[in-house]
Amino acid sequence: MASPATQTANAIAAINNRSNLVIPEIDFTQHQLENGEIVSTTERVIKDVQAPAMYVPTDDQFWSKVDKTKPDIAFLKNHFYREGRLTEEQALYILEKGGELLRSEPNLLEVDAPITVCGDIHGQYYDLMKLFEVGGNPADTRYLFLGDYVDRGYFSIECVLYLWSLKMWYPDTLFLLRGNHECRHLTDYFTFKLECKHKYSETVYNACMESFCNLPLAAVMNKQFLCIHGGLSPELHTLDDLRSINRFREPPTQGLMCDILWADPLEDFGSEKTNENFLHNHVRGCSYFFTYNAACQFLERNNLLSIIRAHEAQDAGYRMYRKTKTTGFPSVMTIFSAPNYLDVYSNKAAVLKYESNVMNIRQFNCTPHPYWLPNFMDVFTWSLPFVGEKITDMLIAILNCCTKEELEEEDEEFPLNAPEPTDAESAAERRQIIKNKILAVGRMSRVFSLLREESERVSELKSISGSNALPAGMLASGAEGIKEAIQGFEDARKSDIENERLPPDIIDPDEDKPASPSASPIMPATPEEIPSEIPYDSPITGTPRTPISSAIASGSPGSPGTPTSPSIGGPPLTAWRPGHGRRTSLGTTKTSPSTRRRSLENTMHLIRDVVGGKDAQGDGQLERLAEVISSPTKGGQGE
């Protein structure tokens, strides 16, 4: 058995011998792709893709040559299409002037036909451009948008600035309603606040929030159709109820304003097995499901033909519900204008064109858009865990520079000057120190590996379908293999169902106050024409999920005998009754980008386990390596 001094000398000799290896020269200006193609690293790989706009516009570019008080619409359209940004002053000007126009409008708009009605946009700017191709040029087409311009998509601020600019140019023909996502609570929980802070500043975000509070809540189209974002409320009897709302504030979590932003038709709308008009909305975690009877009674009471709303993704881009018995017209219509929602729903989008008492649905498919790393992460931050893992792999390789056989070789050329340890206890202590150092390096390698895995999963939307049939991270991951696991619209919808709930209160590490409504002050494919209805007997599917946590604070109860929205809680399909108070939340979502906070805590917990040696996935090979190097007397016995 070779002595420790001999083994040390052998290791040094092995390192010296390997230091003479010639390092091959590498041309870093060229890179070979997986298909064998050689590309230049100093040029754009895909030359036919236009480079992003790397500058902010000058005042001469920004202002219109026709009217110096308004932005140049054509320039903005192209500039945003190239991912360009404005100066903060230019963005704030658009939000201020657009907000003033919105504030001057009533809660309930009255708009005439012909008109094009559009549903949710959700930050899909490139699809918004396609929408205008399908629906018509805003310069000569009347438009009504039903809300949800922001969140989920990564181009929300471009959608807002462009639509607000159009409002400045066409205040009498382009109308914007408020959706449930136009509030501080949801924009902080999802992506819009993060996007504003990344692309502009929190000042721009706050200006957006103030402007959102000016958005009208509803519209009557052609004196026949009520257009709202969500649905009906037990507090909504006549249209005058809408006119009396104080809309210049953050949406409450109960009451009429909440319901018209959050309510949905019942899942089995038109074939209900209940006599109730309103049932607790367990999918949203607040507001109500309204029934066919509730819709028919409201329409008859207000002499209207139908309710046009958005708020729910639709596979075909739209849905017509059961017809009323008196008019034979669909009682409710849902329009959704974000194609291939979240890049995985594979749904079509649609707009509703109403002209000369003829209603046509125009469908369109998604448009390719630039890719963003999760949560607007830069490539250096994204790649750091990968680099760290490789560095620790190199360090471990250095420690394992020679084999056990090389360590055991006897060679008279190396003098044995080092004294043999005489104290067995001291030798054991030294061996333990060496072993601990090697294991520490191994744990650091595990930490970097863990960080890399967590980076890969930052944007992943975890499936919580009881069967776990769908892999975690399918809805926001760019990996094609993960996307292929989703078979269709319903798979995507069921996996994303938790994100349809009213989020819990969350506290930003940079802020002292929770981002909740109560914390915010009150502030003053080729398109084709298709049949205008589809079979209304196909139910909307929606499976309630197990609640994750309770986090919503209680709101103010309604006055005695006044119907109030049950914000959250209770068993599914609980009928409203007088005095039905607000309860705590049954639901939250683990899957939005705001979970960066909770994901970070989880990652730190895992790292502590690894560093503390509690990680069950420890490297057995590293353990054996540490044992061999630190215990030379056992080297011949181990593998």
UniProtKB/Swiss-Prot annotation:
InterPro entries associated with the record: Calcineurin-like_PHP_ApaH, Metallo-depent_PP-like, MPP_PP2B, PP2B, Ser/Thr-sp_prot-phosphatase
Cited SMART domains: PP2Ac (SM00156)
PROSITE patterns hit by this protein: SER_THR_PHOSPHATASE (PS00125)
Catalytic activity: O-phospho-L-seryl-[protein] + H2O = L-seryl-[protein] + phosphate; O-phospho-L-threonyl-[protein] + H2O = L-threonyl-[protein] + phosphate
Transmembrane segments: none
EC class name: hydrolase
Cofactor annotation remark: Binds 1 Fe(3+) ion per subunit.
Biased composition annotated in UniProt, kind: Low complexity: 515-527, 546-572
Residues the entry annotates as binding Fe cation: D120, H122, D148
Pfam families associated with the record: Metallophos (PF00149)
Assigned EC number: 3.1.3.16
Region (Disordered): 494-602
One record GO biological process: positive regulation of protein localization to nucleus
Active site (record annotation): H181 (proton donor)
Swiss-Prot/TrEMBL cofactor(s): Fe(3+); Zn(2+)
Gene Ontology CC, one term: mitotic actomyosin contractile ring, intermediate layer
Compositionally biased residues, Basic and acidic residues: 494-503
GO MF assignments: calmodulin binding; calmodulin-dependent protein phosphatase activity; ferric iron binding; zinc ion binding
Subunit organization: Composed of two components (A and B), the A component is the catalytic subunit and the B component confers calcium sensitivity.
Biological role: Calcium-dependent, calmodulin-stimulated protein phosphatase. This subunit may have a role in the calmodulin activation of calcineurin.
Protein name per the record: Serine/threonine-protein phosphatase 2B catalytic subunit A1
